[in-house]
Amino acid sequence: MNFGGFIMGRFDEKIMLVTGATSGIGRAVAIRAAKEGATVVAVGRNEERGAAVVAAMEEAGGKGEFMKCDVSNKDAVKALFAEIQEKYGKLDVAVNNAGIVGASKTVEELEDDDWFQVIDANLNSCFFCCREEVKLMQPSGGAIVNVSSVAGMRGFPSAAAYVASKHAVSGLTKAVAVDYATKGITCNAICPAGTDTPLTERSSADIKTRMAEIAAQGKDPMEWLKNSMLSGKTETLQKKNATPEEQAATILYFASDEARHITGSIVASDGGFTTY
């Protein structure tokens, strides 16, 4: 039943993992999925925010729990999935959402630490999780949705590490789809553009700093900004950012049984940002 935009019962009896679940898009996914019947394992690093997500899921009439994990740490990820296996015995849906934007720098400006911080948070975390997810899903199938970015579909200035990591997530998504299609596992990537989340706010602050640096070099910061990854609401056809709830609706469609025939797709959820 569709109730106020929610599809009640869509995820009944499903065990769903959501990483990066304590804020932004991940939080919206966890709350809506719980409302639609899933038992949600909300994963993040902040216990206080994790408890708040669980409370929000329960307030929405759903159920779930918080499991603390740094998903960029392969041993921590193995321990996380061992706990899920022991407690639930299966995994039906996984939304790999954890990630960062990182330093706004060109290739020559990036230090090694800048690079590896973003690769660990965005790509390695997704790989570590996918590797464990397919093991738990293979007996009965499942759905994996990786949250990539429009930066996984095109390039942007001063975002070398982020663009590389998100293109790699899109590639990993296709590889998983190819390897596990006959085992009943779908794997798709959603590529948001501007979305009103704490991550976007932090990135916007970093971009303001970057614009000041460009101006100090005698260059036009507005020329740089209009091509940047976070160039603002006016750069989408819809002239607005998405809400986390709008992105969650798209993600959960691909996580649902309604999308069983879709796999290996890299889907722009970007208000038309990548059409021009």
Swiss-Prot record:
Transmembrane segments: none
Protein name as annotated: 3beta-hydroxysteroid dehydrogenase
Function of the protein: Involved in the modification of secondary bile acids into iso-bile acids (3beta-bile acids) via epimerization of the 3-OH group through a 3-oxo-intermediate. Catalyzes the reduction of 12-alpha-hydroxy-3-oxo-5-beta-cholan-24-oate (3-oxo-DCA) and 3-oxo-5-beta-cholan-24-oate (3-oxo-LCA) to yield isodeoxycholate (isoDCA) and isolithocholate (isoLCA), respectively.
EC number: 1.1.1.-, 1.1.1.393
Keywords for the protein's UniProt record, in alphabetical order: Lipid metabolism, NADP, Oxidoreductase, Steroid metabolism
Coiled coil (UniProt feature): none
Binding site for NADP(+): D70, V71, N97, Y162, K166
Active-site residues, Swiss-Prot/TrEMBL: Y162
CDD domains per record: SDR_c
MF annotations from Gene Ontology: oxidoreductase activity, acting on the CH-OH group of donors, NAD or NADP as acceptor
Entry similarity comment: Belongs to the short-chain dehydrogenases/reductases (SDR) family.
